[in-house]
Amino acid sequence: MKIEELEKELTYKAKHVYEEIDEEEKNLLEKIAKEYIEFLSIVKTERETVEFGKELLEKEGFKENDFKKGYFIYKNKFLACWKLGKKPITEGLRIIVSHIDTPRLDLKLHPLFEDTDLAFLKTHYYGGIKKYHWVAQPLALHGVVAKKDGRIIKIVIGENKEDPVFTICDLLPHLAKKIQAEKKLSEAIVGEKLNVLVAGIPVEGKDEKVKEKVKLKFLELIYKKYGIKEEDFVSAELYIVPAGSAREVGLDRSFVGGYGQDDRICAFTSLKAFLEVEDPEYTNLILFMDKEEIGSEGNTSAKSRIFEGIIYNLIKNSGLSSTADNFFNIMTKTKAISADVTAGIDPNYMEVHDKLNDAKLGFGIAVSRYTGHGGKYMANEAHVEFLAWLLKNWDENKVIYQVCSMGKVDEGGGGTVSKYFASYGMDIVDAGPPLLSMHSPFEIAHKGDLYMTYKAFKTFLKV
């Protein structure tokens, strides 16, 4: 055998998506990317993601809690949807789980204050952010206010062209030498100074007893539009997020740039794949979880018992006894994907990447056999038999993928929800597209990876 043939036969070489797909698939790729950009531009909170999913599911004939083709929503921040397969549920399920929360700024319980005739909203950051990312850029307000009379008032300000936007002011470089420039990057912007500028005109009238007239003007405006008072902030979920639409990035339009791609890119692709799979062999279950970015705490997260309730209901409605034995027997036959993004190699920061093992943008869905950090702490590690089965099916269906880790061993790491689901006994692996600028207000994904993630999920749900 010639050396060239030997090399081709025995060595591994990653494949670029655009070098492997034909014009028909490139057209489909662009269509999916356009749909994704529209989704990403309007869906910026967990509640908005659930609302989007519910609308799409009902349009496709899914009914709440229907046994054969149904969905379940909990607290408006968790969504599950399923369709029964040809094989009985005792043969196991095909599960894809992603998370729909994203790093952001939450308003504090008592957020509104006035200082030097300017009105601000105080925030508390949610999830892992670099605080300097959030200053000096246009911001929008998304969320809901729960009134004592039971009404839920939805608020979105800063997304329409006619809307005002908000911002967090930065300090000019002329005055920033001691307070910012001489400090570590992580200390230059402190959390308590992530105050959002919201108003600067005093309320009309000259009553000297009223001291905070700009704050009162803000309250007057928000009361006229939404009927809420200052006390209503206590029972509100109001988030500060980047304003504006997702965009194509690059002169060749090869990337999608926008907020919240970790992990709504996996939510979007898994839901789209799920809706397109007809008559699956195994029961398909898609889960959209909350609170992953803060350790999966709370009753809408992967640590909650809500997943067990869904499985027990499926068991019961299948005519089986809803016993722990049946539950765990089904789990041991279940195959799952923890659909989450990973860090793509950024050539500007090669000192933290392992070039041989980390994911490259444009080379397909990234499969992380294990997560965690250091000595694989806090990690799930997929069994190789399951990984080989999955990759064989992807090969047969021409899915372009790469198997990767995330960064050099001692540089850090990350976790996903897979370890919580692995505890039930199912086979599960992490897979999703690599991103640049992850956890920033403007994350970057490659269209080729977006498309291959959708294709990989669709293949998995079929087999």
Report residues per predicted region.
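N-terminal hydrophobic/helix-forming segments and targeting peptides
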Residues: 1-463
